[in-house]
């Protein structure tokens, strides 16, 4: 084992099973109007979350015990309950699906809906805006209206719809005129298509001074590079970064890119001895990547694409296919059990799976390359975040797991990440060998982690994406959790986490879910709302202030998207702001 020491950890949670609780609306709810934008309700929770400069909880034990009666409870899957947030914060609506795009193109006319009903059966396609990137520029970026001042503060996001009609938008935060509030960056071509699908992740690369977006589209996915000027230049990087179901993407202070893949694996029976048992356990199939560019200021100049490899008991943990020799793949292996055992750490390192100096710049399948090289697969890791102030030596990532109670209710599978998990990776300095450790093993109560963002240097926010199947099985909607990152020791689960947001369900999402549950012919949209696009940033476009460098996030702005249904983007603000 390496002698490297993990400098801080998250608290593993007890593997308890949640009994669905009655829908309880948090006390202290209020609603109002802020700058012409609707603010949702907010509630209390048992433990206040501070985003002040030092991040310390200044309350005494009696105050904390008193708050135990004010916990924020999850919403049941019934009706359209409000979305609630812990005390001290409120939600301000920034944009919603029905908002107009100032430069419509083909079927792309609204922020969150395509203009395809009719003839599209049932209803218009929802475009599912996803990961947000907040940026502040010193100059007006310009737009389709000449000489118009679009401001200096912007929020960018990709949209996850398919059919070659996914697109990228820019919300002009300083603009109040609805006619110029939202700008389309990727208009359709002569055939009425953008030829993009499932645009999910987004980030700003301060070295290239460009935006990067990912397409979570399996072997047809990849990375899109977009300039911030007007009109923007758009190109793909398939010959350099490969094609895969990429989702999270994050630069470090050297210009390297951390890329997270979400590609669901083959499902197998939850009971290997019973062929009639549900096929709900997914074989680990997705990888954690790092791209080391030859020139940080020009990604097209090539470089090395690497993938994470962990050693369990001194042996590399590699992909095992589901086939005649391995009918359950690696789903039930001892190695997967060890990997997901809280309190353990495992040596890990980066292995090169593609080098443009050797392999050229032809398009390639990154997932296949990672498997061939012996990288370690995970159960759909969707996003990652660097620990603020860690010098980019530490990052967290979150496999979503199986999103199915048929799998999670099997103890052998729950112990192997069926409910989802959060891992931590440490590479101190320029060390070639790091440590991988599981810091949250999901449960029925805290499950299916999809999105991560640091609220401050010690509080990690994790959004759930359970999906309609798991929502129905447990009669619970999603939440956003806050986990305490603490240096040097474990804490009890009581003090390590709390529910930060209890997601509700808007009326459009309720209708979608009813149609989907009924199997309405031609229905093509998602059902229940999902929290996504968690993003906390001061908006700096500078290399010297790259997101993750500073430990102090006191001046950062906070955003998230209530995806599906009305497709609402919210800003999270302090209640007194």
Features from the language model and the residues they span:
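Positively charged n-region of N-terminal signal peptides that target proteins for export
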Residues: 1-4
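Bacterial N-terminal signal peptides
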Residues: 6-16
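Sequence/structural signature of beta-propeller domains
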Residues: 21-577
């Amino acid at each position: 084992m390496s002698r490297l020491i993990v400098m801080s950890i998250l608290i593993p949670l007890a593997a308890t099973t949640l009994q669905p609780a009655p829908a309880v609306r948090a006390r202290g709810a209020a609603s109002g109007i802020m700058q012409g934008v609707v603010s949702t309700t907010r509630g209390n929770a048992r433990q206040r979350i501070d985003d002040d400069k030092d991040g310390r909880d200044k309350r005494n034990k009696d105050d904390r015990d008193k708050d135990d009666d004010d916990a924020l409870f999850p919403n049941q899957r019934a009706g359209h309950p409000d979305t609630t947030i812990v005390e001290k914060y409120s939600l301000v609506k920034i944009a919603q699906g029905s908002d107009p795009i100032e430069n419509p193109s083909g079927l792309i006319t609204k922020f969150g809906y395509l203009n395809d009903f009719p003839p599209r059966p049932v209803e218009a396609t929802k475009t599912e805006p996803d990961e947000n990137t907040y940026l502040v520029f010193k100059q007006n970026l310009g737009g389709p209206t000449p000489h118009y001042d679009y401001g200096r503060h912007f929020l960018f996001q990709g949209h996850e719809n398919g059919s070659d009609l996914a697109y990228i938008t820019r919300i002009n935060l300083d603009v109040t005129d609805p006619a110029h509030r939202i700008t389309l960056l990727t208009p359709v071509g002569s055939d009425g298509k953008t030829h993009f699908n499932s645009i999910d992740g987004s980030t700003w690369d301060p070295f290239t001074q460009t935006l990067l977006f990912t397409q979570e589209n399996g072997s047809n996915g990849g990375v899109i590079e977009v300039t911030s000027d007007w009109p923007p230049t758009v190109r793909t990087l398939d010959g350099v970064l490969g094609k895969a179901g990429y989702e999270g993407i994050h630069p470090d202070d050297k210009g390297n890119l951390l890329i997270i893949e979400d590609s669901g694996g083959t499902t197998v029976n939850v009971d290997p001895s019973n062929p009639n048992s549900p096929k709900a356990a997914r074989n680990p199939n997705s990888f954690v990547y790092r791209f080391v560019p030859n020139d940080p200021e020009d990604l097209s100049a090539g470089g090395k694409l690497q993938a994470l490899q962990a050693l369990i008991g001194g042996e590399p943990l590699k992909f095992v296919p589901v086939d005649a020799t391995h009918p359950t793949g690696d789903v039930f292996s001892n190695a997967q059990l060890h990997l997901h055992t809280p309190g353990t750490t495992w040596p890990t390192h980066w292995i090169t799976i593609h080098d443009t100096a050797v392999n050229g710049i032809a398009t390639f399948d990154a997932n296949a390359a990672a498997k061939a090289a012996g990288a370690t697969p995970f159960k759909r890791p969707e996003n990652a975040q660097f620990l603020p102030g860690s010098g980019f030596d530490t990052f967290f990532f979150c496999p979503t797991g199986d999103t199915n109670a048929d799998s999670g209710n099997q103890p052998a599978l729950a112990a192997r990440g069926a409910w989802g998990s959060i891992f931590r990776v440490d590479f101190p300095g320029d060390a070639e060998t790091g440590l991988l450790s599981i810091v949250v093993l999901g449960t029925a109560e805290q499950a299916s982690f999809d999105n991560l963002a640091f609220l401050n240097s010690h509080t990690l926010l994790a959004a759930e994406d359970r999906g309609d199947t798991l929502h129905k099985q447990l009669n619970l909607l999603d939440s956003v959790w806050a986990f305490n990152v603490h240096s040097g020791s474990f804490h009890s689960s009581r003090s390590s986490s709390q529910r930060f947001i209890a997601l509700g369900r808007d009326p459009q999402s309720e209708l979608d879910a009813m149609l989907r549950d009924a199997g309405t012919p031609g229905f093509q949209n998602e059902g229940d709302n999902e929290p996504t696009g968690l993003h906390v940033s001061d908006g700096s476009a500078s290399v010297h202030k790259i997101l993750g460098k500073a430990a102090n996030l006191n001046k950062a702005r906070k955003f998230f998207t209530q995806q599906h249904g009305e497709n609402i983007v919210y800003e999270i603000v302090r209640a007194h702001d």
